[in-house]
C-alpha cells in the first residue's frame, strides 16, 4: 500500500537517507527544513523529493509523519500544530525500529567509524543480493523485495534502543556527546543495553577495553589485529598510496587476502568487521572479496578533490579519535606531503570536555588552522570556551582563520589540506577553493 510520508527536518543525515529509501520503495515523500544548504539535500533534489519551509500547512491527518529528534513544540511550528490537533507522528528512531522488522537487519553502532562501516557493509551486500540500506551520510536505498536491511545505529540519547537487529557490529566505545552522556560508564551502559537486543551475532572490536565488557544474548565475535583474544584477525597488512591490503583469519583458519581502496588502519578494521559478519551470516567470501575492492567511500569521510593542483580532503571528523584516524589516512596516501589540518570544533560542550584531547590529536598534523566553534541548536554559548583556548594548547603554532579570509592557507608548498568538522567547515573549504581558482584565473 502506497503512503505519503512527511519528514519534519528532512535534511538530517538519517532522515534524508530514510526519505530516499521510502521514495525508492514507491511511496510519496516530502519534507520540511531550514533554507540553509546542507550536503544531504542534493540527493533529495535529484530524486525529486520536495523540500518545503516549516509550515503547519504541511501537516495533514492522512500523512505518515516522521519527526527529527531535535524538534519540539517550542521550536517547531509543525510539531506544535500536530500536538495541538491530535495528529500523531513518530520519531525517526521509533519508525526505524518498526520498519526493520520486515527484514534480516544488520546494524552498525559505535562512537566512531559507524558511517564508513555501514557504507562498506551496504556496498558489499547490495552487490551480492537485493539489499535496502540507510547510511548516516544521507544515502539510502529501498527495495520492497530485499531480504536484508543494513542501517546505522546511533547511540545519541539512546536512540538505538528501539532496534532489535539480527546482527550488529560495534566499532568502539568512547566518551562523546557530553551534552547527554554523563561519563564513559554512561556511554558503556547504553551500548551494553543495545547489545542485549541483538539476536544472532554481535561483532565487536576486541582491542577496545570497554567493548570487552559487553555482554549479549547473541554469540559475540571479536575482531582485531592481535591474534590473542580475537576470532577474526587482520594480519600481514600492506598499506600503500593506492589503498590497503591484508589477510584475515578466523580462529586460526585463513580466509584469504582482501584489498580495499581506502586508507588508515581504522578502515582495515572496518572492513574486517564486515568480512566477519558476512562470513558468519553465510555469504560467499569470494563475492565479499570482489566487492570490497570497489568500495568508493561515503560522503564527507576522507572525500578528496583537486583544485589548481592542490589536494583538498573533506572529513566529518569532530572527535579526537576521528581526527587521529583521518590524519593517519592522509599520511598513508600522501607520505611526502605536508599535512595541513583545518579544524572546526563542534559544540561547546564537546570542546570543553575534550579540549586537551583535541590538542593532542591535532598535533599529529604538520600545521594547524582553527575555525570558530560551531554551536549546536541544542546548546547556548555561555562563554566558557573559545577556539583560542584550543589554539593555545596545540604544541605546533595554530592560527585561527575567518571564513572570509583563508589566505593564510596559501603559506604552504607541497601540502595536503585536510578540512575536518561536523558544523559548517565546508564553507571554509569552499572559500579556499574559490581562492585557489582565482589564483589560476588571474595568472596572465
UniProtKB/Swiss-Prot annotation:
GO terms of biological process kind: cell division; cell wall organization; peptidoglycan biosynthetic process; regulation of cell shape
Gene Ontology CC annotation, any one: cytoplasm
Chain sites annotated for binding ATP: 110-116
Keywords: ATP-binding, Cell cycle, Cell division, Cell shape, Cell wall biogenesis/degradation, Cytoplasm, Ligase, Nucleotide-binding, Peptidoglycan synthesis
Superkingdom, taxonomy of origin: Bacteria
EC number: 6.3.2.8
Catalytic activity from the UniProt record: UDP-N-acetyl-alpha-D-muramate + L-alanine + ATP = UDP-N-acetyl-alpha-D-muramoyl-L-alanine + ADP + phosphate + H(+)
Pathway: Cell wall biogenesis; peptidoglycan biosynthesis
Family listed: Belongs to the MurCDEF family.
Cited function: Cell wall formation.
Protein name: UDP-N-acetylmuramate--L-alanine ligase
Protein's organism: Streptococcus sanguinis (strain SK36)
Amino acid at each position: 500500500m502506497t503512503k505519503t510520508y512527511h519528514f519534519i527536518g528532512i535534511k538530517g543525515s538519517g532522515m534524508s537517507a530514510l526519505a530516499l529509501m521510502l521514495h525508492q520503495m514507491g511511496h510519496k515523500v516530502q519534507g520540511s527544513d531550514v533554507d540553509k544548504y546542507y550536503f544531504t539535500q542534493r540527493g533529495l533534489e535529484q530524486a525529486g523529493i520536495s523540500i518545503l519551509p516549516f509550515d503547519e500547512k504541511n501537516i495533514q491527518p492522512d500523512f505518515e509523519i516522521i519527526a527529527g529528534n531535535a524538534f519540539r513544540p517550542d521550536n517547531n511550528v509543525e510539531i506544535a500544530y500536530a500536538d495541538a490537533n491530535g495528529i500523531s507522528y513518530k520519531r525517526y528512531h521509533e519508525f526505524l525500529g518498526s520498519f526493520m522488522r520486515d527484514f534480516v537487519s544488520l546494524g552498525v553502532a559505535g562512537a566512531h567509524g559507524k558511517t564508513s562501516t555501514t557504507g562498506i557493509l551496504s556496498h558489499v551486500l547490495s552487490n551480492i543480493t537485493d539489499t535496502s540500506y540507510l547510511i548516516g551520510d544521507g544515502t539510502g536505498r529501498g527495495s520492497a523485495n530485499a531480504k536484508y536491511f543494513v542501517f546505522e545505529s546511533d547511540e545519541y540519547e539512546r536512540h538505538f534502543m528501539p532496534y532489535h537487529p539480527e546482527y550488529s557490529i560495534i566499532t568502539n566505545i568512547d566518551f562523546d556527546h557530553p551534552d547527554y552522556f554523563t561519563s564513559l560508564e554512561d556511554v558503556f551502559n547504553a551500548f551494553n543495553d543495545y547489545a542485549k537486543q541483538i539476536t544472532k551475532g554481535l561483532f565487536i572490536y576486541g582491542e577496545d577495553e570497554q567493548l570487552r565488557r559487553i555482554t549479549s544474548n547473541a554469540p559475540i565475535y571479536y575482531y582485531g589485529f592481535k591474534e590473542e583474544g580475537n576470532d577474526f584477525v587482520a594480519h600481514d597488512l600492506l598499506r600503500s598510496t593506492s589503498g590497503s591490503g591484508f589477510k584475515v583469519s578466523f580462529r586460526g583458519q585463513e580466509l584469504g587476502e582482501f584489498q580495499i581502496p581506502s586508507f588508515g588502519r581504522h578502515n582495515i578494521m572496518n572492513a574486517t568487521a564486515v568480512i566477519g559478519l558476512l562470513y558468519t551470516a553465510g555469504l560467499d567470501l569470494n563475492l565479499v572479496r570482489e566487492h570490497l575492492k570497489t568500495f568508493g567511500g561515503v560522503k564527507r569521510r576522507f572525500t578528496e578533490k583537486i583544485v589548481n593542483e592542490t589536494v583538498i580532503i573533506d572529513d566529518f571528523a569532530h572527535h579526537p579519535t576521528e581526527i587521529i584516524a583521518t590524519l593517519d589516512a592522509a599520511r598513508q596516501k600522501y607520505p611526502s606531503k605536508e599535512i595541513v589540518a583545518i579544524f572546526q570544533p563542534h559544540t561547546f560542550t564537546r570542546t570543553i570536555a575534550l579540549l586537551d584531547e583535541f590538542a593532542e590529536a591535532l598535533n599529529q598534523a604538520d600545521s594547524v588552522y582553527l575555525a570558530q566553534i560551531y554551536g549546536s541548536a541544542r546548546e547556548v554559548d555561555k562563554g566558557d570556551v573559545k577556539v583560542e583556548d584550543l589554539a593555545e594548547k596545540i604544541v605546533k603554532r595554530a592560527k585561527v582563520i575567518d571564513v572570509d579570509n583563508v589566505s593564510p592557507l596559501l603559506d604552504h608548498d607541497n601540502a595536503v589540506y585536510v578540512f575536518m568538522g561536523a558544523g559548517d567547515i565546508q564553507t571554509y573549504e569552499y572559500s579556499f577553493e574559490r581562492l585557489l581558482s582565482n589564483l589560476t584565473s588571474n595568472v596572465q
